[in-house]
């Protein structure tokens, strides 16, 4: 094998289709575009979503919902997540370091999902009534 003998595998390369270059090429005259109509003409393509003047689907359907501007700054943490943490005291910094909440989060709330079997002190976080009861039942407390 020499460098001058190297070539691509058979069938791996295809010649570019040259259209509109005479009748003998097999792709002359209309160049594969058919006869007449918008798509046969130069520049004859409509924009995405255009339905020929009919009211397009994206405008027929009503607008719904909104984007919350506070979503990035508030987070929820489950009892299951807290159970997995090694820390005896849990605050926002501990949650950020563990990757349970994002870096932008300013406040977090503990929700009752999963079980808590060990004593944990929650500092500076909100908690639902169910989560509060579960934390206190496990011997933990919620500090302000």
From Swiss-Prot:
Q: Mention one GO biological process in which this protein takes part, according to its record.
A: translation
**Which InterPro entries does UniProt cross-reference here?**
Ribosomal_uL15, Ribosomal_uL15/eL18, Ribosomal_uL15/eL18_sf, Ribosomal_uL15_bac-type
Give the keywords, sorted.
Ribonucleoprotein, Ribosomal protein, RNA-binding, rRNA-binding
MF-aspect GO terms: rRNA binding; structural constituent of ribosome
Which spans are transmembrane here? none
Give start-end positions of Gly residues composition bias: 21-31
Q: Where is this region: Disordered?
A: 1-48
Q: Which Pfam families match?
A: Ribosomal_L27A (PF00828)
Which cellular components does GO assign to this protein? cytosolic large ribosomal subunit
Q: Subunit arrangement?
A: Part of the 50S ribosomal subunit.
Q: Which family does it belong to?
A: Belongs to the universal ribosomal protein uL15 family.
- What does this protein do, in the record's words? Binds to the 23S rRNA.
* NCBIfam families (UniProt xref): rplO_bact
Task: Please state what the protein is called.
Answer: Large ribosomal subunit protein uL15
């Amino acid at each position: 094998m020499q460098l001058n003998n190297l070539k691509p595998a058979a069938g791996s390369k295809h010649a570019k289709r040259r259209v509109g270059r005479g009748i003998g090429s097999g792709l002359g005259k209309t160049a594969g575009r058919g006869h007449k109509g918008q798509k046969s003409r130069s520049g004859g393509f409509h924009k995405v979503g255009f339905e020929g003047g009919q009211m397009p689907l994206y405008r027929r359907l009503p607008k719904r919902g909104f984007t919350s501007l506070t979503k990035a700054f508030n987070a929820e943490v489950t009892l299951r997540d807290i159970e997995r943490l090694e820390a005896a005291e849990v605050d926002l910094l501990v949650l950020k370091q563990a990757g349970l909440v994002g870096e932008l989060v300013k406040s977090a709330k503990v929700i009752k999902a999963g079980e808590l079997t060990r004593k944990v002190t929650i500092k500076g976080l909100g908690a639902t009534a169910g989560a509060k009861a579960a934390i206190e039942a496990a011997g933990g407390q919620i500090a302000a």
